[in-house]
Amino acid sequence: MGKIRQGFIKRVARELVNKYPNEFTTDFEHNKKKVQELTNVTSKKIRNRIAGYVTKLVRMKMEGKIL
């Protein structure tokens, strides 16, 4: 079974994608830097998890799986 992301990671990622839709791409490294700039997350692990979920959301939007 896979790991389930915590609710606050999903919530923060969704808020970032909705608030700054043109800031994020499908590139994880770029998204990681943007998450660092736009949030006050101090933990590297949490920042990377948020950036990973942002990347997934952007990819899903491009494929038309979410609105």
UniProtKB/Swiss-Prot annotation:
GO biological process, one term: translation
InterPro entries: Ribosomal_eS17, Ribosomal_eS17_CS, Ribosomal_eS17_sf
GO MF terms, alphabetically ordered: structural constituent of ribosome
Pfam families: Ribosomal_S17e
Keyword Ribosomal protein (UniProt): yes
Keyword terms, alphabetized: Ribonucleoprotein, Ribosomal protein
Alphabetical list of Gene3D superfamilies matching this protein: Ribosomal protein S17e-like
Recorded GO CC terms: cytosol; ribonucleoprotein complex; ribosome
Ribosomal protein in keyword set: yes
Matching PROSITE patterns: RIBOSOMAL_S17E (PS00712)
Assigned protein family: Belongs to the eukaryotic ribosomal protein eS17 family.
Subunit-structure text: Part of the 30S ribosomal subunit.
Name of the protein this chain belongs to: Small ribosomal subunit protein eS17
Organism: Pyrococcus furiosus (strain ATCC 43587 / DSM 3638 / JCM 8422 / Vc1)
